[in-house]
């Protein structure tokens, strides 16, 4: 699931191309989470997550994970010498020859961890494990809330369009039913009539939504990317990134959906004359 628009990737189709070219497919599954999508079952080689988002669920940690499917032959070509060729630092050891299906994982530990030092601190690991215990329950609420709010926004005359893939009007709707049957996530954008200034006013007037650049939180978050995270880009670049001047991004949380709708309603009234 893409950021910011929440578009749904056809992983099996991309996986087929990757297999034909002899390259690994790496999927960032942060926004879908393992609850909504299992990329390895759809053909991915590696899956990455920002654990700061839904896995922990409350924005209290910084972390990430890499999940290795173990289904890629790193020695099938000369494209991956770090895994198939002798490693001088380990007396000529060949990672794929020695560790087989776990070659990438052990290379990440023996080389990546050694050189870069990325280690999740124990407290962050504890919070993350606690978050994962409630992942399925939270994602059900995230998706339910997102669908209700996106439907309301789509029917509001102050809104030009909504990108939520769970809506029947979305070009990704059928793909979602096929590949993401549990839901299309909880991140999407919508365009506000009134453009840039109206979006800024909207964000300034919300009371329940938090104006934060993070996503995947139990708290509902809002941001106008064109005036914040994507401000340095040209209008053409913003448009290409899905962060045009008239677009606001929402990360829907687990609060009461009707409360969130009332908050957006009053903020839109303040923003759009």
Where are these regions (language model features)?
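PLP-dependent enzyme catalytic core of the Aspartate aminotransferase-like
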Residues: 2, 10-11, 138, 204, ...
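Short hydrophobic/aromatic beta-strand micro-patches
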Residues: 67, 189-191, 251-253
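Alpha-helical elements of the RecA-like P-loop NTPase motor core of helicases
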Residues: 37, 151, 200, 258-262
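Short, glycine-/Ser/Thr-/acidic-enriched flexible segments
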Residues: 71-72, 169, 193-195, 227-228, ...
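Conserved PLP-enzyme active-site core in the AAT-like
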Residues: 1-156
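Short glycine-enriched loop/turn motifs at secondary-structure junctions
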Residues: 59-60, 182-184, 243-246
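Structural preference for beta-strand elements that scaffold enzyme active sites
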Residues: 24, 46, 161, 187, ...
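Conserved small-domain helix->loop->beta segment predominantly found in fold-type I
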Residues: 116-121, 125, 130, 134, ...
């Amino acid at each position: 699931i893409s950021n910011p628009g929440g578009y749904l990737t056809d992983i099996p189709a991309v996986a087929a191309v990757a297999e034909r070219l002899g390259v690994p497919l790496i999927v960032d599954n942060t926004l879908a989470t393992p609850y909504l999508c299992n990329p390895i079952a759809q053909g991915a080689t590696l899956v990455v997550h920002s654990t700061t988002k839904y896995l922990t669920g409350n924005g209290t940690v910084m972390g990430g994970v890499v999940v290795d499917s173990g289904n890629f032959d790193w020695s099938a070509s000369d494209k991956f010498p770090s895994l198939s060729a002798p490693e001088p630092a380990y007396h000529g050891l060949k990672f794929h020859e020695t560790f087989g299906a776990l070659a990438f994982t052990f290379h990440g530990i023996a080389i990546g961890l050694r050189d870069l030092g990325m280690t999740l601190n124990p407290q962050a690991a504890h919070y993350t494990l606690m978050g994962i215990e409630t992942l399925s329950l939270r994602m059900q609420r995230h998706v339910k809330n997102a669908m209700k709010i996106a439907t309301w926004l789509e029917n509001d005359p102050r809104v030009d369009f909504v990108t939520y893939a769970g809506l029947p009007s979305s070009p990704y709707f059928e793909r979602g039913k096929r590949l993401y049957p549990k839901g299309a996530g909880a991140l999407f954008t919508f365009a506000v009539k009134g453009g840039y200034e109206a979006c800024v006013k909207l964000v300034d007037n919300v009371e329940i939504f938090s104006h934060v650049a993070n996503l995947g939180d139990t708290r509902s978050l809002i941001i106008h990317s064109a005036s914040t995270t994507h401000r340095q880009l040209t209008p053409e670049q913003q448009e290409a990134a899905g962060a045009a001047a008239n677009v606001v991004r929402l990360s829907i949380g687990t609060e009461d959906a009707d409360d969130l709708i009332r908050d957006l309603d009053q903020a839109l009234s303040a923003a759009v004359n």
